[in-house]
């Protein structure tokens, strides 16, 4: 018998925020090494690419699951589940006291991470009496494009997200399927909107689902507790 056939890995099942049920195994040493190398590179594109490849390796069902097409929050949740089953439910993070500016190391419980603002319905927003827009949430591949932007939630990023995620535009006369239109045409439409209507776009995208961890930490020097909030997915990419 081959040595590689001796090892038997456990299998787990999880229901993702979108409702998709997946069956998976924990990642193994070779995959942990891939993640460590990505972490050390500090290159976000490489990190996300490695996360995608590790998830793809570990998924048993559904077969041939296209990670790129999953909602980005499904991939985030799935990776956190994989991390829990593979290496334990806690990681060490550094937190900063906003009052004293001191940094401390503390333990983060991965099982307490929540994904907020989730709805499984496509979002429809009425811009004015004549126009409404239906959005979809960004897929993981969309999320990678967005994450490469450098202006956080600035105008360029909001335009990029909006252009990617506009699903349909409704007028009194017709319904326009934007998935069949060039990206540039959608951006041109968005750029012609009055400021008040564009702000409705901004509010939607700023309230998209996100991972969230809320706790508190007691400063051992002052004895005062301060809140700890983590919302950036990369903060959980700690092995």
Model-inferred region functions:
Residues 1-239:
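Short, surface-exposed, charged amphipathic helix/loop patches that serve as local interaction elements
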């Amino acid at each position: 018998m081959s040595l590689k056939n001796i090892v038997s890995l456990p299998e787990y099942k999880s229901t993702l925020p979108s409702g998709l049920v997946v069956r998976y195994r924990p990642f193994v040493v070779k995959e942990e090494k891939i993640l460590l190398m990505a972490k050390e590179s500090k290159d976000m594109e490489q990190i996300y690419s490695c996360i995608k490849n590790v998830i793809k390796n570990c998924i048993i069902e559904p077969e041939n699951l296209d990670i790129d097409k999953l909602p980005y929050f499904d991939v985030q949740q799935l990776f956190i589940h994989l991390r829990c089953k593979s290496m334990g439910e806690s990681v060490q993070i550094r937190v900063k006291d906003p009052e004293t500016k001191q940094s401390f190391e503390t333990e983060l419980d991965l099982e307490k991470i929540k994904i907020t603002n989730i709805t499984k319905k496509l979002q429809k927003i009425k811009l004015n009496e004549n126009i409404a827009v239906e959005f979809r949430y960004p897929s993981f591949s969309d999320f990678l494009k967005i994450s490469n932007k450098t202006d956080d939630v600035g105008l360029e990023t909001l335009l990029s997200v909006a252009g990617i995620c506009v699903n349909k535009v409704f007028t009194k006369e017709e319904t326009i399927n934007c998935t069949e239109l060039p990206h540039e045409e959608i951006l041109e439409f968005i750029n012609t909107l009055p400021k008040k209507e564009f702000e409705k776009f901004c509010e939607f995208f700023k309230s998209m689902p996100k991972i969230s961890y809320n706790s508190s930490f007691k400063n051992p020097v002052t004895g005062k507790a301060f809140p700890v909030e983590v919302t950036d997915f990369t903060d959980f990419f700690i092995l």
